[in-house]
């Protein structure tokens, strides 16, 4: 993918707060199931914003940084998802979201970001991303010094 969308820590916090506001009132939720690993940070932020203490994980493996591969369910909570928010950082192709819908038909599936191929599978999200754009999450990056332009020419 040639295009990149970079999400800073501040932006992630803001996006998650916006997503949390859409989930009010918080009392309707039994808990949050964060999809590992991308949904862990958004799940923690949502848990804080909504005052939810019951947080668990759904562990589905389908990516090796930038390459999609076969989907494997490593860990999954019991039940049909009723009363739970399932939190993802991104819905891309929709493959993981389809699997989550199959596993937990009564859960509310939400994500911070959505691409067109998977957006219809979500109940809520806050950021539209073009299908041909790669997202760089803040936990995948570091801040580093960049040489000023005028020094490069010497």
Swiss-Prot record:
It holds the Pfam family Pribosyltran. One of its GO terms (biological process) is IMP salvage. GMP binds at residues 69, 92-96, 134-135. The keyword Membrane applies. GO terms for cellular component: cytosol; plasma membrane. Homotetramer. Belongs to the purine/pyrimidine phosphoribosyltransferase family. XGPT subfamily. NCBIfam families: PRK09177.1, tet_prtrans_34. This is Xanthine-guanine phosphoribosyltransferase. It comes from Vibrio campbellii (strain ATCC BAA-1116). The gene is gpt.
């Amino acid at each position: 993918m040639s295009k990149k969308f970079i999400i800073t820590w501040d932006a992630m916090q803001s996006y998650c707060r916006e997503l949390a506001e859409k989930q009010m009132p918080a009392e309707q939720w039994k808990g949050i199931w964060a999809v590992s690993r991308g949904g862990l940070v958004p799940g923690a932020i949502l848990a804080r914003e909504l005052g939810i203490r019951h947080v668990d994980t759904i562990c589905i493996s389908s990516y090796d940084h930038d390459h999609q591969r076969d989907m494997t369910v490593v860990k999954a909570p019991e039940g049909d998802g009723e009363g739970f928010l399932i939190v993802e950082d991104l819905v891309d192709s929709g493959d993981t979201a389809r699997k989550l819908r199959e596993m937990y038909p009564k859960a509310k599936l939400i994500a911070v970001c959505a691409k067109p191929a998977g957006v219809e599978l979500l109940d809520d999200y806050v950021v539209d991303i073009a299908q041909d754009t790669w997202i760089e999450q803040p936990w995948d990056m570091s801040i580093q010094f960049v040489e000023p332009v005028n020094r490069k020419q010497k």
